[in-house]
């Protein structure tokens, strides 16, 4: 009888520990989603403010050239839409999100120079760093002690100074930078929301 009680106690403690970990992971997931949503909103505001200050002829020029431009994230293999994202594993979505955020470590410093508001510039750098750290913890949680077999996570992106070496003029370069930042934050928000929704196992979870 005593042995049965001990075993029951061990099982209950284990369940409580696992529930605690699950709760912590869910809070972290919710936190990273909120952070990337804020970054996406910030990116949208920045590009709108930039556009509002353009001269009509500059706006017409950019409308013709920017759709043909590439972002450094185009070198990162990723789902092209929500449907494809929903078919990807949670770990894959987290890894791609990490890679996308990582691609802005250098570019965010360049991005900060295009923003006149120093508070906004600081917010970008801090939130990108926090987001990268949070996603890294979630990836480790998904691996659950298993080795990370995705060697591509540690490979440098091609053309790390991509946004510095383009032959665009300053106006086009700045607009491209803002447009790419908005596009990438939209991607990360989509991937993290899909991953979080899948993890919650909530049938009412909406994307």
Swiss-Prot record:
Domain of life where this protein originates: Eukaryota
Leader peptide range in chain numbering: 1-22
Alphabetical GO biological process terms: animal organ development; growth hormone receptor signaling pathway; positive regulation of growth; positive regulation of receptor signaling pathway via JAK-STAT; response to nutrient levels
Disulphide linkage map: 71-180, 197-205
Any Gene Ontology CC annotation: extracellular space
Binding site for Zn(2+): 38, 189
GO MF, any single term: growth hormone activity
Keywords tagged on the record: Disulfide bond, Hormone, Metal-binding, Secreted, Signal, Zinc
Locations listed in the record: Secreted
Keyword flag Disulfide bond: yes
InterPro entries with a match to the protein in the record: 4_helix_cytokine-like_core, Somatotropin, Somatotropin/Prolactin, Somatotropin_CS
Main location: secreted
Family: Belongs to the somatotropin/prolactin family.
Biological role stated in the UniProt entry: Growth hormone plays an important role in growth control and is involved in the regulation of several anabolic processes. Implicated as an osmoregulatory substance important for seawater adaptation.
Protein name in UniProt: Somatotropin
Species for this entry: Labeo rohita
Native organism taxonomy: Eukaryota, Metazoa, Chordata, Craniata, Vertebrata
UniProt gene name: gh
